């Protein structure tokens, strides 16, 4: 039996709905990755990026997005999730580009005050792969005596 199983589309959809955090990676002169929350609405992965103002100053992520909208977004549910090792390790890796969302109401998202400088983006998926480990419990983490 293979160590990993590729997820079906319905499993990917469930995985995206049941998680809230991922790592957004960008590449400019130096690779850059940042952990962040996301929303999954209407089959779209939505990311809010602070642009300036009271939350942050314009930083590296916005500079990278000016150079290239190409990103990689990784969502991982580690085996050690909760109090046991019983859950299979599951990973989803998405490659694509970011597109600014102009119509927040389409996704059921309220307008935010102008004082909060936050842009909403969705990932335009070019490629994705998702799999989970078949090992139960994980032999990689279990020490045999």
Residue ranges, per PLM feature:
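Charged, gly/pro-rich active-site loop segments
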Residues: 2-6, 78, 82-145
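A short mixed-secondary-structure module that forms the rim of ligand-binding clefts
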Residues: 39-81
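Amphipathic alpha-helical interface surfaces
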Residues: 12, 57-61, 105
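A generic structural signal for short beta-strands and their flanking turns/coil linkers
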Residues: 20, 34, 43-45, 67-71, ...
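N-terminal leader/targeting segments and the immediate start of mature chains
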Residues: 1-18
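A short, Trp-centered hydrophobic/proline-enriched beta-strand micro-motif
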Residues: 14-28, 70-75
């Amino acid at each position: 039996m293979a160590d990993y199983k590729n997820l079906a589309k319905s499993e990917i959809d469930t995985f995206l709905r049941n998680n809230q955090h991922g790592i957004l990676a960008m590449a400019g002169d130096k690779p850059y990755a940042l952990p962040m929350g996301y929303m999954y609405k209407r089959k779209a992965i939505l990311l809010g990026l602070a642009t300036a103002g009271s939350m942050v100053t314009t930083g590296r992520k916005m500079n990278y997005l000016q150079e290239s909208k190409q990103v990689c977004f990784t969502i991982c549910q580690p085996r050690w999730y909760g109090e046991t090792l019983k859950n299979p390790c599951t990973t989803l890796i998405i490659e694509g580009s970011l597109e600014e969302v102009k119509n927040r109401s389409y996704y059921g998202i309220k307008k935010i005050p102008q004082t909060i400088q936050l842009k909403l983006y969705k990932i335009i998926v070019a490629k994705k792969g998702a799999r989970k480990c078949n090992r139960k419990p994980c032999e990689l983490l279990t020490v045999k005596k």
